[in-house]
Amino acid sequence: MSASTAAPARDRLRIAIQKNGRLAEPARSLLAACGLSWRQSRDKLFCYGESLPVDLLLVRDDDIPGLIADGVCDLGIVGQNELDEQASARRRAGLPAAYHAVRGVGFGQCRLMLAVPEEWDWQGVAQLAGKRIATSYPAILADWLERQGIDASVVELSGSVEIAPRLGTADLICDLVSSGATLAANQLKPVELVMESEAVLAGAVREPADARAALLAMLLRRMDGVLKLRDSKLLMFRAEQGNVDALRRLLPDADPLVQLPDDGNGALRLQTMCHGAVTWQRLEELERAGAQGLMVLTVERSLA
């Protein structure tokens, strides 16, 4: 099916995620936190939604943008780098991308960087002129080189990019970097950022207009509730009225304080949602400012 052909009416939503790799487990955990559960097929590539009519496809990450563009899947969790690479390649071929990033999902952060042999005296991007750059992201790199006004050769490799300079097939590389350990092991050093990336929920530009529309809206609302509270804690305590302003100043990253019904002990009962780290040091600071009976609770989900 071409990207311009309307997808057939369906009453079940389909989501594609990476079968194996660094995004697989976080993606599945996020969807499970949204209330989804599945029955796995024998080939372990298709998971039938049991709690809701939302099915899961387990595929290679570089297949996900195409599955969305062709209407096979409605959504996918994939790296922004993979999404941009295929969108750029489609534009260069005169095709519409037909998909976009709907939400960042808070994991899979990495950087696409240029890396050169350690012995290079890096002076800046002007050194790239006439050089051969190995990468698995040729379209992103070509776009970046054009923006920099640099004429260099792009050597496309599907894997083991970091070994290309030692093999003599390239002078330097453009590859994803997380910790930098792989670069160091291959006597390379990162020198220039090409793009920041993270995992995103991707969807078709044209949203479904059939029964899937309500499922999509519900899923996005649930996901927002999970993501908003992922690093948040519910903080509950008692305090005298005269200490409330000082306590509020110690909670700049928290929602407004909410007063709960009086428990008969004279002090106010208060609670708030903290969106930053609630450390022992922070609790002790609040205690010194007059907070009593401090409790920190984990919140899994919310409907705002």
Curated annotation (Swiss-Prot):
GO terms for cellular component: cytoplasm. Pathway: Amino-acid biosynthesis; L-histidine biosynthesis; L-histidine from 5-phospho-alpha-D-ribose 1-diphosphate: step 1/9. It is found in: Cytoplasm. Feedback inhibited by histidine. SUPFAM superfamilies: Periplasmic binding protein-like II. It catalyses: 1-(5-phospho-beta-D-ribosyl)-ATP + diphosphate = 5-phospho-alpha-D-ribose 1-diphosphate + ATP. InterPro entries: ATP-PRT_HisG_long (IPR020621), ATP_PRibTrfase_cat (IPR013820), ATP_PRibTrfase_CS (IPR018198), ATP_PRibTrfase_HisG (IPR001348), HisG_C (IPR013115), N-reg_PII/ATP_PRibTrfase_C (IPR015867). Pfam families: HisG. Its cofactor is Mg(2+). The keyword Transferase applies. Its main location: cytoplasm. One of its GO terms (biological process) is L-histidine biosynthetic process. It is an enzyme of class 2 (transferase). GO terms for molecular function: ATP binding; ATP phosphoribosyltransferase activity; magnesium ion binding. Keywords: Amino-acid biosynthesis, ATP-binding, Cytoplasm, Glycosyltransferase, Histidine biosynthesis, Magnesium, Metal-binding, Nucleotide-binding, Transferase. Its EC number is 2.4.2.17. PANTHER family: ATP PHOSPHORIBOSYLTRANSFERASE, ATP PHOSPHORIBOSYLTRANSFERASE ATP-PRTASE. HAMAP family: HisG_Long. Belongs to the ATP phosphoribosyltransferase family. Long subfamily. Catalyzes the condensation of ATP and 5-phosphoribose 1-diphosphate to form N'-(5'-phosphoribosyl)-ATP (PR-ATP). Has a crucial role in the pathway because the rate of histidine biosynthesis seems to be controlled primarily by regulation of HisG enzymatic activity. This is ATP phosphoribosyltransferase. The gene is hisG.
